[in-house]
Each structure stands twice: as structure tokens, then as C-alpha cells.
């Protein structure tokens, strides 16, 4: 049975939530494999908006949903998000939601450190959500994390907290921040331990069992591949690997378990926070895209930067992630434009290149090379059939396919999950 990885191919906010929700109808299991509660999904179901930032999208559909070991989990946010969804009428029990026992936790010390750095102590503003994601991953790599399973081992938890705070209190002293007493952190964790522990499981075994049963597994990525810690616009990236390969490490399933990688891309480009953005439009076009596309962050409410579709960037991530097909979203936002531009290459220091360099200084110097296409006046919003799209919209989509080297598998024409043109089935064996 085919399993599918969904990965963003831009800087996040590509519309993965809707696509994952749409695909989850065919899936038996939905897995989050990286990130934390710093990236949000908005699902619109029967006119009701559900905002998720930590829980997998499958929980809203009653599918078995797994938070894998590659995710850093804020236990207090977990409880809060759970309550909000339950208040909206979503039934969530340990039968449909499981959390990896070896997932690392986000604590208040991580949020403190994240905020202190972002507020200027480090001298580098990345544009993080200040939710402690980066510091939590630092502790994971530094082998001092408090993990889910530690909440169940109360006789050794205090010793682990003390070891963690030997590192954090030294940092806090250097930054002029008051030190944290181990008992304070212990009490914070005990406040929510009884609420989160029933969801804990050895999830790699659970996923292996479901795979052997022939169930379809959908791996849900957060953010976008261009924010990847290795392959993104470093240092203006997130703290985890967001490319498709992380699905294996962050879930405990091997590469042989995945049969299709579906990339998600907007019909234009957006970015939140700092960092290079070659096709950004700081003009009327950017304002048009932002207002028409309602480009404000789900988690932070921050206004997103907007620009033309960057085929160079998407093609690069298609190759790195082994993407076989693209779900193109928000085509309807482009309705009414007289002309639409696509970036087909870059120019830097007088020479042409067909990739985004790794050097941040070079990334800032690249100039986009545009191809201009005729726009369309007809509405694509809510279109359900390929044949009903305006001729120029079809030409635009076909040109994107040519430039990025893979076909468009799904085409989204509104936030509603039903408004999706189905071209290729990612779950087909």
C-alpha cells in the first residue's frame, strides 16, 4: 500500500493543511515528523476554521494521528490545543492521537532563551516565533533534553532537570537573566503530566505495525523545505530539517516505507520573517497578493512578504526532496492580473545561474530573471474541473510544470477542501 510524504517547497505557508486534510480522507494514519508549534495549519471544514500548530491534521477527521520523535513538544501547548479542538466539538482520545515516547519537550527555559536572543542579545534577528523551538532542538542535540518518557519516571526526573539547568542557568547568568530553580521546572511539568502521558506510545512500533497491516500512512511536514536547517537560506531557517528525508528520521520508519513525495507550492511566493527573497514585490503587486491571499501568519498573525512564483527555488527543492508531483495552491489569488511573472533564473555579479547559492551574501545579491505571461480576467475560484479553467490559467500551470520538472498532481482553487482539482492520485500503488 502506498504511503505519501507531504512537504512544502517554498518558505512555508504553502497550504499544506488543506492538502493534508484532503488526502487524509484516503489515509489511515497521519504523522507529524518535525518542527513544533511554530508553524500553523488552518483547516476549513463546513465553514468552520480549525487552527492547528502542533497536532496532526488527521485529528480533525478522526484518523489515527501520530506526533513523531522528530517533533519537539510543548506539553502545555499540547494540552491547550487539545482543549480548543475539543471545545469546537472534535473528539480526541488516545485511540486517535499518539505521541512518541522519545520526543523532546519544550520547556519555559527554552521560550525564555528564544525570546532573549530574538530581542537582541544575540545580535542576530532571525524572525522566530519565540516559542522555544530552536533552544529545544539545541538541548536534544546536546543530549540534555527532557523527553516525554521522562515524565513517567518521576524518581529520576529531578536529576535530569538539574543537569539541564546547569547549562541553562550558566547562559542566563551571562545574559543577565534570573536563574531558574529546578523545582519550578519540575512543578511546571507535573501540572500537565497526567494530561499528556495517556497519549504517549512507542510510535515507531505502532507505525511499523500499521504499515505491515497495509494501512496508508500520510507524513505531514511543517513549514517549507527552503527553511531547512541544511538546505534553506541559512541562518534564516528553522531549527529542524524540513526536507522529505526527515520523514524517516522523525517517525522511525525507513526510506522503503514511502512511495510518493508530494510537494506543495503556492502559485506565487510568500515568506514570513527575515531572510533573502529574490522575487519579493515591495509594491502594489505585493500588496495585492497579500490582501487577496489573506497572507497573515496562523501562529503569529504577522504579515507575510509576497512575490512572484520562483521556479528556480521550487525546482531546487523538488530535486532535494525527490518530489514526484506538486499540489499547486491559491491559483485563484492571481485572478484579475493583467500579467503574471515567473522567475526562471537568477543573475549574480553579471553571470546567470539556475540555483540558489548556499552563501547568504550571494543569496542577497541574486537578481531574478523573469518570464512574463498573460493573466486572466475570468474567475478560477471554486473551479472543480481542469477543462473549466481559463486558457491563460492552464498555460500558466503548464509553464510551471515545464520549469520545475514534475507534474501538477493537485490544484487548489479556494481554502475549502472540496475546491480541489484532482489530477494524479499520490496514494495510487
From Swiss-Prot:
The active site is at 13 (proton acceptor), 41 (proton donor). GO terms for biological process: 'de novo' AMP biosynthetic process; IMP metabolic process. It is found in: Cytoplasm. Its cofactor is Mg(2+). IMP binds at residues 13-16, 38-41, 129, 143, 223, 238, 302. InterPro entries: Adenylosuccin_syn_GTP-bd (IPR018220), Adenylosuccin_syn_Lys_AS (IPR033128), Adenylosuccinate_synth_dom1 (IPR042109), Adenylosuccinate_synth_dom2 (IPR042110), Adenylosuccinate_synth_dom3 (IPR042111), Adenylosuccinate_synthetase (IPR001114), P-loop_NTPase (IPR027417). GO terms for molecular function: adenylosuccinate synthase activity; GTP binding; magnesium ion binding. Plays an important role in the de novo pathway of purine nucleotide biosynthesis. Catalyzes the first committed step in the biosynthesis of AMP from IMP. NCBIfam families: PRK01117.1 (NF002223), purA (TIGR00184). This is Adenylosuccinate synthetase. It comes from Bartonella bacilliformis (strain ATCC 35685 / KC583 / Herrer 020/F12,63). The lineage of its organism: Bacteria, Pseudomonadati, Pseudomonadota, Alphaproteobacteria, Hyphomicrobiales.
